[in-house]
Amino acid sequence: MTQPVQTIDVLLAEHAELELALADPALHSNPAEARRVGRRFARLAPIVATHRKLTSARDDLETARELVASDESFAAEVAALEARVGELDAQLTDMLAPRDPHDADDIVLEVKSGEGGEESALFAADLARMYIRYAERHGWAVTVLDETTSDLGGYKDATLAIASKADTPDGVWSRMKFEGGVHRVQRVPVTESQGRVHTSAAGVLVYPEPEEVGQVQIDESDLRIDVFRSSGKGGQGVNTTDSAVRITHLPTGIVVTCQNERSQLQNKTRALQVLAARLQAMAEEQALADASADRASQIRTVDRSERIRTYNFPENRITDHRIGYKSHNLDQVLDGDLDALFDALSAADKQSRLRQS
């Protein structure tokens, strides 16, 4: 869901209010609110700076035009300032384009094996490692919240939390929100003795994580909470206490498991955060579906998402079917070199949002 175009005057006023709020020591007694205000301020700061540059350039241009009336030597300066004003005006227009309100958010990412049995589970593990390597390249923190492994060490399913360590307007969600869907792999499985290429698939789901669980309405009476013995790798070794937590949201049937934190309380807290992210995504996707049947097809669930990308090992090729992107550096992509692909997806998304505005 994108925000509508906002007028610059409204944003300038908001920026001034946020600046005052950040200077108030009382704000910092609430870390979550301070982080929200800080992120919003960081989002508006470049817009305000560009507006100030544009205003200054327009003033200089007006002065140069007055001078050129009596002195032709200022003609070149007028031309340069006209170009500068046009450039800054285009930048500001782009900054004011509709924007995903979750772009600064951290994420919860789930990887699930699909058709293809053991090979699919191994590919799901490859995808999880790819995202972990990408996060490491950007200095983000990755926590494995839950994992179910296959016989050969693949992932039947895994849940990761990926968090930025900085309050920036372009957070983890802004880069990784396009990963939800079905990912297909074409390669010779390790279980294939004849050397034949097989096709299998794995699913990825991505949710923006709310700043606080309280942002999403969750009724305690709607929850069933079970505790059991952890079976995951969990930090520095296998957790042998009954600290794993499974939360079932009865109205929707959503089940969230967390077992890799060190205590039952920590696992419950993380499971509630994941549940809040999934409920928030469900509510927003339903709103999109209600607003537009065309947008409903983009709902991020593995069962209903169409194939978004193919990883072809024999040809060392990756193809993103949504935008026709192709590259022959599959080995680098699986090592977390995803920025070129994500830049292309972001550019296509920006064009789409501009058309809708």
From Swiss-Prot:
This is Peptide chain release factor 1. Keywords: Acetylation, Cytoplasm, Methylation, Protein biosynthesis. Its main location: cytoplasm. The keyword Ribonucleoprotein does not apply. InterPro entries: PCRF, Pep_chain_release_fac_I, Pep_chain_release_fac_I_sf, Prokaryotic/Mito_RF, RF-1. Gene3D superfamilies: 3.30.160.20, 3.30.70.1660, 6.10.140.1950. GO terms for cellular component: cytoplasm. It comes from Mycobacterium tuberculosis (strain ATCC 25618 / H37Rv). Belongs to the prokaryotic/mitochondrial release factor family. It is found in: Cytoplasm. The gene is prfA.
